[in-house]
């Protein structure tokens, strides 16, 4: 969730021991988009990985390891993960999961709302882990 969500995303990317991730309001989307259009002071140093964009954006890394299961809970008005950045992420990552033959391994919930944790988010996360672990 939140800071833990982005931490779980980056750990999911780099550590093969992490079989699946489900960041809730975790700041996943596009670092490039957020840097250009978002409120940069919203995220602390934990979010800005030095030099990351010289290698790729969050979607590039997720697409590269498809079909490793990933679920995002991305409220459409979450200041920490603008909808436009999430949309860019989905547009790049979804085809990678389809090409890998496991489109069900990538699940995105873009519910109306702000940065908050709801029972619906937890229920979606539990169902995702039950199915993928």
Language model segments and positions:
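Residue-level signal for short, function-critical loop segments
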Residues: 2, 76, 112
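Active-site signature of alpha/beta-hydrolase-fold catalytic machinery across serine-
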Residues: 10-14
């Amino acid at each position: 969730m939140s800071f833990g969500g982005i931490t779980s995303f980056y750990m999911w990317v780099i550590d093969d021991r992490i079989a699946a991730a489900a960041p809730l309001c975790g700041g996943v989307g596009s670092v490039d988009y957020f840097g250009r259009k978002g409120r940069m002071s919203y995220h602390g140093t934990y979010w800005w990985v030095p030099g990351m964009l010289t290698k790729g954006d969050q979607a590039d890394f997720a697409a590269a390891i498809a079909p490793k299961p990933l679920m995002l809970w991305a409220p459409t008005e979450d200041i920490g993960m603008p909808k436009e950045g999430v949309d860019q992420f989905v547009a790049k990552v979804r085809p990678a999961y389809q090409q890998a033959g496991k489109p069900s391994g990538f699940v995105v919930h873009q519910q109306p709302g702000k940065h908050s944790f709801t029972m619906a988010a937890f229920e979606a996360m539990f169902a995702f882990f039950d199915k993928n672990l």
